């Protein structure tokens, strides 16, 4: 998997965001943020960012946070294949320094990857014919 952040790896429409908000399969709370995730059925992850003016006042800080989040996602996307991910910023996130944020995101991605539900074994995947069962 390449480490790019192309258009196909972004949540672009309100419908995509709504799907993650309405039924997340994984939640990882962090320091001043929340990560929501949902299986997307694709072979690559997609990222959406929600950083409101109420949470982070200055545009410079919002843009810095978005840049750091995208970069961290890009470097860790092999852990996150098949997920739609939304990061919701909360108050105080803009005051955290860059190295601390990078370290924090590294831990959060690993926690999210560990919290993924393991695929359930179905009758068909176990080699049992459903008509005989």
Curated annotation (Swiss-Prot):
Keyword RNA-binding tagged: yes
Catalytic reactions of this protein: Endonucleolytic cleavage of RNA, removing 5'-extranucleotides from tRNA precursor
This protein's GO CC annotations: ribonuclease P complex
Keyword annotations from UniProtKB, A to Z: Endonuclease, Hydrolase, Nuclease, RNA-binding, tRNA processing
One record GO biological process: tRNA 5'-leader removal
GO molecular function: 3'-tRNA processing endoribonuclease activity; ribonuclease P activity; tRNA binding
Listed EC numbers: 3.1.26.5
Top enzyme class: hydrolase
Assembly with partners or alone: Consists of a catalytic RNA component (M1 or rnpB) and a protein subunit.
PANTHER family hit by this protein: RIBONUCLEASE P PROTEIN COMPONENT (PTHR33992:SF1)
Role played: RNaseP catalyzes the removal of the 5'-leader sequence from pre-tRNA to produce the mature 5'-terminus. It can also cleave other RNA substrates such as 4.5S RNA. The protein component plays an auxiliary but essential role in vivo by binding to the 5'-leader sequence and broadening the substrate specificity of the ribozyme.
Family from the record: Belongs to the RnpA family.
Name of this chain's protein: Ribonuclease P protein component
Origin species: Pseudomonas putida (strain ATCC 47054 / DSM 6125 / CFBP 8728 / NCIMB 11950 / KT2440)
Source species taxonomy: Bacteria, Pseudomonadati, Pseudomonadota, Gammaproteobacteria, Pseudomonadales
Gene: rnpA
